[in-house]
Amino acid sequence: MAGKARVHELAKELGVESKTVLAKLKEMGEFVKSASSTVEAPVARRLRNAFVNNAGSPAPAAPPAVAPPTPTPTPPRTPTPAPPPGGPRVSAKPMPPRRQGVPTPGPKPKGPVPGPPQSATPVTKPASAHDIEVAAAEARAAALKAEQEAAVKAAQAARQQQRENVRREPPTEGGPRPGPRPGPGTMPPRPGSPAAGRSGAPAPGPGPRPGGRPPARGAGNNPFGIQGGQQRPPAAGAGGPRPSPASMPPRPSPASMPPRPSPASMPSQRPGRPGGPGSGRPGSGAGRPGGGGGGGYRGGGGGGGGGGYRGGPGGGGGGGGGFRGGPGGGGGGFRSGPGGGGRPGGGGRGRGGGAAGAFGRPGGRPTRGRKSKKQRRQEFDNLSAPTMSSGAPRGQGQVVRLSRGASLSDFADKINANPGSLVQEMFNLGEMVTATQSCSDDTLLLLGEHLGFAVQIVSPEDEDRELLAQFNIDLDAEVAEDRLVSRPPVVTVMGHVDHGKTKLLDAIRKANVVAGEAGGITQHIGAYQVHVPHDGEDRAITFIDTPGHEAFTAMRARGAQVTDIVILVVAADDGVMPQTIEALNHAKAAEVPIVVAVNKIDKPEANPDKVRQQLTEYGLVAEEYGGDTMFVNVAAKPGTGIESLLEAVLLTADASLELTAPTDGPAQGVAIEAHLDKGRGAVATVLVQKGTLRAGDSIVAGGAHGRVRAMLDENGNQVAEAGPSRPVLVLGLTAVPGAGDTFLAAEDDRTVRQIAEQRQARRRAAAFANSRGRATLETLMEQLKAGEKTSLNLVLKGDVSGSVEALEDALFNLDIPEEVQLRIIHRGVGSITESDVMLASASSEAVTIIGFNVRAANKVREMADREGVEIRYYTVIYQAIEEIEAALKGLLKPEYEEVELGTAEVREVFRSSKVGNISGCIVRSGLIRRNAKARLLRDGAVVADNLTIGSLKRFKDDATEVREGFECGLTLGGYNNVQVGDVIETFEMREKARA
C-alpha cells in the first residue's frame, strides 16, 4: 500500500508554504490538523488539481514522448533479437492499451522486442508536472497489468538471447566490460546522475551471478509487484548466460521523462513488475555493475540491487528489493543511504546499510543500550545551572540621584531600563520587590552597586529644594544689602529637666508658665518675644523654650537649628547632667554662641564654681578663666541676675552676630510647633525668618497648606503682620504641619496646594519604605513566624505634633524582647475621635488608644465601651512610657525555673496489690509535698524523672506535706522500681520574673 503524503511534503512539492496548503485543504472541506498530518491520495490529487486551476495552467494532453501519434503494435509473445550496439536506434513503441481512453505511459520497452529503443526526442517540461504524474501513474498501472503475462515469457526469451550474445560477441568500444561483481566499496553513480541516466548511454554489463534466488515468492510489500495468484518471473541470477549490454535497451533519458510521481499520487494497490533485463521503470537509473534490472517501488534492484525511488546505489549480488528496500544485495530503500554489499540472497537495510546513513546517523540496526555510569557521571558533571538574563543595562559608575522611598520604576526611568528587568535583578539578588513598591535606601544602594551605578539618595532638604525649584522658588537666593534691616535675636533656652528653664523665662516675661505645665515640666516648645530696655533703647528678644526631658531630643535639636544664641541653664546644686551635655552638643552642632546661666544659686548646696569646672571639660571656658564664654549666676524664683543675663545676650548678639534680614517679599520661616485646636482647627506656631507674613497670604508648611485667616501673638492678641524673628500663631491651615517644617508664602492657592501634595506623596513613600521590612528569600519563614508573636498595637493622639513625635520615638527606643512587638497603627494631633475608635475596633488584634494631653468626648467613650476598645490618658510623658513598657513586659510568655523543695531517703519498700510499691521514707531536707514533682536518685544518678508524689501519709493519716526529720509513706504515681537507699528529690516550677 502506497504511503500517504504529509502536508509539508505536499507544500515542498507545490513550492508553497505549509500554512497555504492547510488553508487550501480547509477550503476544500478537509480537516487537517498540522503540517505533519497525512493526506489521502485522492485528497492530494484534488489538492494538486486545485493548485493547477488556480495557476491558470491548462491540463496537458499526452505529450509526444509519452504517446507517439502512430504506434505500431507488435506480437506480444515473439521475441526479437537485439541489434548490434552500433546499429541505428529506433523509437520506442508503446504497448497498445487494454482500455481505451487511458493515455499510455512514456517510452517502455516491449517484452518481445529486446532491441534497444531509440531515445525519444527531449521535450520541454510541461507547465503542470502534477497532472502528468497522475496520468502517467494511472496509465502505468493499467499497462502493467495488461502486459503481465507477455512480459514474463518475453523476459525469459530475452535473458536466453542475452546469454548467447555474451558468449558469442565481445563488448563494443566504450561500453563497460563484464567483470566480477563490484564490492561494497565500489560505489556506482546514483540513478539520474549524468553518468548513469544519460540518454543513450549503454549500461555496464553484469558479471557472473552466483546462485539465484527462489523462483517464486509472494507479492510482499511491493505495490507494483506480482499480485496474489500470479507467477513471479525468475530472478536475474537464476543461472544461464547474462544478457549482453549491447542487447539491452538503454534507459530513457530523464529529460524525456515526466517527473517522478510523489507517494501521495500513487494508487494504493499497483500490479507487480518483472525485474527483467533493463526493464526499469521511467525514473530509475541505469543498471548497476554486477547486475541489471530495476527495483520495485521504493525497493532495491534485482540482481545487484538497482536503486529504487530515490534509493541509494545497490550493492553486490542478491535478490530484488521489496517495499522500502528489500534484502536484495544491499539495495537502497526510500531515501536511504548506500547499501552494503550483501551476500547471495542477503540484503542491506532500507534505512541505510552498513555504512553511515544520512545526517551522520550510524548505520546498522539501532540499539537502545543503557549508558554507562561513567557516561552518566560525565553528563551530570557537565551540567551547568541555567542563567537568567534580565537585560538590565550595566553602568560604568554613573551617578544616579534617587529620592527617599523611590521605586524600581523611578530607578528604571533614570537609567532608561525596563522596570521588569530590575524586578528580575532584585529576585536574582534574593529580594522580592515589585516595580511600584517604595524601596528602602539599602535596597536602592544594593541594586545600584550590582548594576554598576553610583546611587545617591537625595536628602530631604535637597529634595525639597529641587521641588521648590520647579516653581521658581529659591530659599537660598542672595538678598541685596540695601534690602537688609536689623532684626531681633532668637534665643533658645536649653538644659536638663527641672533645672529651671521655664521658670527663668517666667522671670524674664514676669509670668507664670510652669503652673500650666503638667508635672511641672515643659511638654512642647514655647516661643515668646519680650522687649528689654538696653542703652536707652527698647530691644526685642525672641525666646524659644525647649523641653529638657530626654524624650524631647528632636525638639531640642530643632530649637538649636532656628536660634541665634543658646542660653544653657545648669542648676548650681545638680551640676552637669546628661541632657545638659546633649543640649551643649546640639548648640555646638548648630555653631551658635552659648551663654551659660548658672541657676538656683540661692540654694544652700549651690556650687557655681563646680559648674564652671565641669563645663570646662566640654570646651566651655569662662571668661574669668581666660575663655570666651559668658557665665551668669541667676536665681529664677527671686529674680536675681535676670538683667545681667539679658545684657549678656544682647552683648553677644551685637559683638558676635550680624543679625539682618529683608522685610519685603514673600515670608519664609519655620514651624516651631503645631496642634489641632477643637474650635480653631489646625494651629501652627511659626517663626518668620525672611519677609513679612500678612493675614490672607497663601502659605504652605510641610504637607499642609492654606490661607492665613488670623495671626495671634504670645498673649493671644491678633496681629496684622509679622516681620523677621517674630513668632506668631497662624490659623487657617488644612492640616497640622510637622514640627520643624519650613513654611513659605506663595502668590496663589494653586501653587501652595501642588507643593503640599508633592511633599505628602514623597513623605508617604519614604515612610512606607522605612516601615516595611525587607522581604528576602532567607527571611521569608521568619516573617511567617512573626505572625505568631504577641504584639501591642497603639493609636497615639496628642495635643501637639512635637509631643506625639517625642512619645513615638521614646516607645520605639524601648528595649523590647523579641517575643513581643510594638506597632503604632496610627498617630495624630487632636482629641480622640470616633474614627480612631473605629480604626481600633476594625483591627484583628486588640488596640489601645493613648491620649496625651487630650481627652475623648462622652459619645466617643460610649462607643469605645461598646466596641471594647481601651483608652488611656496621660499628661506626663514619662508616665506613658513606663506604663507602656510594663504592658509590653506583661505580654511576655512566662518563664519557669525549678525550685527544690526537699529530699527523702527510702528506708523500706512495701508491696501492695492495690497501689503498687509504697516507699517508707524519712525526710532529710526541706519538705515533701503531695502532688509535687519528683525524681528518683540511686547512687547519685537519676533513675527516673518527671515523677509525681501520688499519695503521702504520716502513719495511717493522709498528709499534705511532711517536713524535715519526720517519717512518711508515699507512692510515686505507679512507678514501682524503688529500692532501699534510693533518694526521692521533690521540686516545683516557679514563674521567673521577666526583665
UniProtKB/Swiss-Prot annotation:
Stretches for region G5: 635-637
Region named G1: 495-502
Biased composition, class Basic and acidic residues, residue ranges: 161-171
GO cellular component assignments: cytosol
Ranges annotated as biased composition (Gly residues): 273-363
InterPro entries: EF-G-like_DII, IF2_II, IF2_N, P-loop_NTPase, Small_GTP-bd, T_Tr_GTP-bd_dom, TF_IF2_bacterial-like, TIF_IF2
HAMAP family: IF_2_B
Name of the molecule in the record: Translation initiation factor IF-2
Species assigned in the record: Salinispora arenicola (strain CNS-205)
